[in-house]
Swiss-Prot record:
The gene is cycY. Required for disulfide bond formation in some periplasmic proteins. Also acts as a disulfide oxidoreductase in cytochromes c biogenesis. The cysteines of apocytochromes c must be in the reduced state for covalent linkage between the two moieties to occur. It holds the Pfam family Redoxin. Belongs to the thioredoxin family. DsbE subfamily. InterPro entries: Periplasmic_diS_OxRdtase_DsbE, Redoxin, Thioredoxin-like_sf, Thioredoxin_CS, Thioredoxin_domain, Thioredoxin_ResA/DsbE_sf. Disulfide bonds join 92-95. NCBIfam families: dsbE. This is Thiol:disulfide interchange protein CycY. Residues 46-190 form the Thioredoxin domain. It comes from Bradyrhizobium diazoefficiens (strain JCM 10833 / BCRC 13528 / IAM 13628 / NBRC 14792 / USDA 110). It is found in: Periplasm. Residues 1-37 form the signal peptide.
Amino acid sequence: MSEQSTSANPQRRTFLMVLPLIAFIGLALLFWFRLGSGDPSRIPSALIGRPAPQTALPPLEGLQADNVQVPGLDPAAFKGKVSLVNVWASWCVPCHDEAPLLTELGKDKRFQLVGINYKDAADNARRFLGRYGNPFGRVGVDANGRASIEWGVYGVPETFVVGREGTIVYKLVGPITPDNLRSVLLPQMEKALK
């Protein structure tokens, strides 16, 4: 009996030493796969149905339309108008992809298109808008990112539909694409315009 317990003991010790490593690897793999499978656009915004943040942001200096400085973000600008608020940056690759779609949206005068320039250098932001055209009637500069936090932004680009009463009715996480523009964003805009 003592021979069996002696021979089983090293195997048991080895197993007990390897068990935490196996558990760690298993948890790491589970975390990795779950992390990659999440869709951030499915995370509901706590701001839906609530008033848009009372955020005042300075204009992007030097950005002009018809030889007039494009105004910054003023909370009063949302009252009585349906607005599409896009949080963007020149360093954001998906922002470059969605820029032509925003330019097309900017032609629709039934609503105002507002831009929040997030943690960007002014020269780069102006160059970005010069390259694609400025679709925004207002561009507020959020140099430190605090205003975007108030809007519930955790990455760029993000787009919000704000109703006439100044309440957020929809939030799109990620870039505007032809698919989500047609299937989600435009229907949300039409609903807000009624």
